[in-house]
Amino acid sequence: MVPTGFVWNSPTQIQINIPSYTNLTIDTTNISTDGLANYGFNYTDETGAPPAISSVAISSDGKGVLINLATAPSGRFGRVSYATVENPLQSGASVKPSGRTLGARGCVRSSSGITWVYDTSVTLYDWLPAFRINVF
């Protein structure tokens, strides 16, 4: 399950296409969103102040992610990244945070998984891996 491309649906909406055997979902139960903006998605470009992401949602067909920007980008070299930013270094800590609560992470996964054979109370999902994709 990796992004295969993107489409600009409007001057402020990017659709990242992600083929999956089941529909995509945003999981905020298994992944902590404390300190995590936009479910792990970021938008950057060459300007010093790229437009902020105003919302992130799963597309109506369940096979893509819709990223809405607050304003149309004015800079070149736009890029969407996912699961690449960790929480800031905690006060007094000497090691960057990691893991599903503080590390670089995202909340997108397949909507159905498989039951783990060694513990039938555990469901294993297909998680969207970290990526960066140029959108200009």
Residue ranges and their predicted role:
Residues Y21-F136:
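C-terminal beta-sandwich/jelly-roll accessory domains of carbohydrate-active enzymes
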